[in-house]
Amino acid sequence: MTKNNIFTPGENCWVSSEARYVTPLIDCANYYKALHNAISKAQHSIFIVGWDIDSRIRLLRGKDEENAEAPSVVSDLLAWKAEQNPDIKIYLLRWDSSLAFFAQREMWAKEVWEEKTPDNVETQLDDTIPMGGSQHQKIIVVDDELVFSGGMDISTNRWDTRDHPVQSEERQGPDGEYPPLHDVQMVSSGPVVKDFATLVRWRWERVADSEPIALREEADTGLTAAKPRTWPDDFPPEFENVSCALARTIPFMDEVEPAQEVRTMLLDLINQA
């Protein structure tokens, strides 16, 4: 490992990769707006993996919500997309949670999603995580050509704007107004999308009886590819041809090799600082 090549697959990452385009989405208002636009354009498949996927969440607020052609509430949006295009496949994989988090999350999530969406939307709760652990990968892959990844879930008490006002009429959760919240997601295209698409399918296959839709081989994820059709309109690429890697934490589970890639990556980055 050198300063010019910090990524070492099998040690501090699962795979090293490249992103054709990358844009950071700072704070949830920007992330949800970009996500809404990308979902509205989807034609092939949508994979949503998260700590939570709450059907009640409004992705848009204010004038964006008033002027949108597609529904703002995420369950309505996915139902609209699934009905608009019966051939699209949508997969929702949420952590099954523990009793400690029941008050923070939507009750009977799998049944709620199944009631609110048509049959081409499939929902699973991941209960393979050992007791005491949780599922913290927050990944959305759209048409196998675009990926959102980072720290934000589609969950209650997440939405906020960049200015973080002390009080906000729009910053309301099930229990009323909540305090400002800062977080970051990013949207990427290029070869890294195929890596994320492989990862989310592996996650799905571990808990579901059905196999997910095959990877869309015609998706242009090369380093010379044009901006994908599903790229969110109001968020132009900020970086091009970025070296990156996927680092995971995998606990001891049946028939799965554990991994401490995130820990190792952080230590390697600190050592090279």
List PLM regions with ranges.
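Charged, low-complexity intrinsically disordered terminal segments
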Residues: 1-273
